[in-house]
Amino acid sequence: MLYPAEYDITILQNATWKGTFRATQNRQVVSNIDVATATFTCDCHGLTAGTKVVITGGTTIPCGLTLNQIYYVITTGLTTSAFKLSATSGGAAITLTGTATGTFYVATPLDLTGYTVDSDIKGLSDGASIGTFTPTITSATDGAFELALTPATTAAFTTGRYGYDVSLTASGGERYYWLTGVATVQKTYSRN
């Protein structure tokens, strides 16, 4: 069973809205990042050399680490509770400087090959549809996709709070609700 993540958004009337997302799986808490050695600690992580991962979360992000970017686990420093990352498959370890604070997570991207993405906006109380996002898978093997709304679509939205969700449907018909949230539509005042 997949439980959707929650992410609230704001949409401006009569404006383009775009969001870039990455579907991930097997998320685990990183208990420590040793910036000096660029070593990530995560007990019993189960990762192997060459595995694609992304790092998310954190309060203070060390220099040299980009959140939600694809990295590769490397053999150097790999144990059952620690790993190092490279920006390229089989490449050298990334270098980190500064400090790392807050809770970080490691996850593997979901391969979206053969999947379709669907996302609708509906009334929170009545469930009436007010619009549909245009989804585009930008890198299937990296789990990356975009959702977009055109100004013509958002111009028809009434200001207020709505619900939205994102579903991922596999080629075999299995459907998962990956993301849900509140979409707040705000009025704009500029001339067209």
Where are these regions (language model features)?
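Small/polar beta-strand repeat architecture
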Residues: 27-109
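Contiguous segments within soluble domain cores/interaction surfaces
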Residues: 1-26, 107-192
